[in-house]
């Protein structure tokens, strides 16, 4: 949890926003997945947002669903995902690592056991995509017991009550949704979210990172100009993996070429 605090403090000092890539653990296989994550960090990623393969990913569009299918095809299991997380943490001691999960994966392990395992391997935050704020108590309580930041999604139509709850319960960062719907780079991020950012600040929420539909440097800049602390990009990155699925070296080069200008756009 503290890794987010020190990251945001460092970025503020350098007058930069955060660029956070999302990938699915184990896509397209464990070994290449680790190389992908190393490449993202070398290219300038400030934090990681990682998914674990799940059979029914409701919030995800086709690009990330395909990533899950590739990971399943490679035989990736939840237990292996935790092994991979431990390896990432060992190699990269300071980078914040966030998980994007679905509730069933947490229930399968047992809520407390799941967060205990997260703490053990060095995960900093968990966002459970299909658990609304009002049903989040058992998750966020277990998270805090194990020093893991509970992350909440702030939708573009959030009312004042929801904004207050997100500010009060969330830690680490706030996932600011560019638009409603499922993930995907095809639908570009919509209107600037200045009013939401202002309210979240007023209620002392964790720093907002804007996600969904972020696929170009100008959108990263726009998110930061609107007051967000940074931007999360998933589908655009996962698409690069898909496009170069049979050319591992080309894939890593293309990922690097994508991340560098995205990170550069965070510098004012």
From Swiss-Prot:
The active site is at residues 49, 60. The keyword Lyase applies. Its EC number is 4.2.1.20. It catalyses: (1S,2R)-1-C-(indol-3-yl)glycerol 3-phosphate + L-serine = D-glyceraldehyde 3-phosphate + L-tryptophan + H2O. Keywords: Amino-acid biosynthesis, Aromatic amino acid biosynthesis, Lyase, Tryptophan biosynthesis. GO terms for molecular function: tryptophan synthase activity. One of its GO terms (cellular component) is cytosol. InterPro entries: Aldolase_TIM, RibuloseP-bd_barrel, Trp_synthase_alpha_AS, Trp_synthase_suA. The keyword Ligase does not apply. Belongs to the TrpA family. The alpha subunit is responsible for the aldol cleavage of indoleglycerol phosphate to indole and glyceraldehyde 3-phosphate. Tetramer of two alpha and two beta chains. This is Tryptophan synthase alpha chain. The gene is trpA.
